Amino acid sequence: MKNLFIEENGAYSIDCKAAVWATDKIHEDYHNAGIHINDVDFLIENSTHILMVEYKNACLASAKNPEAFHPMEDKKISIITRKFYDSLHYLRLLDKTKPVWYIYILEYPNGDVTTRKRLRNRLKMELPFSLQENIGNGKRLIDRVDVLSIDEWNADSQC
């Protein structure tokens, strides 16, 4: 198993040496099967959970027009939400049944803890939290969603 994943810009890595299982091949696997979806960047299994990790960094020096990135736009929310739903199939095909946390690692100009919490709350409205409560007794699709900076991700011992 590859233990160190490099994000698409080559600027940061995610160390998964302590993971039970991890992959950054979800997009490649779907593409090879002729299926075009919106998927998360990384899937990481620890001892208790599956982490679906989406990464976006508009603060890189190579970012084109980072001020134009607005993560609270309806279209951006829709894409991030769809990545969660589209990636659930992959976990099912691999018979990964642990509870799921959806983690959005986000860096963008003027981003702060308050805006990330607002975004997290907005995502909660689009993800199946209320559906799980309304329907009830089956397996939960998601247990937690967080929007974190790189520093917050690095400091969170549960991730």
Where are the language model's segments positioned?
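Short, conserved, surface-exposed binding loops centered on an aromatic residue
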Residues: 34, 42-45, 93-96
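Short, low-complexity, polybasic intrinsically disordered segments
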Residues: 104-157
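Short charge-dense sequence patches
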Residues: 28-42, 66-77
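Acidic (Asp/Glu-rich) sequence patches and key acidic residues
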Residues: 38, 49-52, 64-65
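Conserved catalytic cores of phosphodiester-cleaving nucleases, focusing on short active-site segments
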Residues: 42-44, 49-59
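Catalytic cores of nucleic-acid endonucleases
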Residues: 58-109
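Basic, amphipathic N-terminal segments that precede the first structured/catalytic domain
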Residues: 1-39, 47, 134-140, 156-159
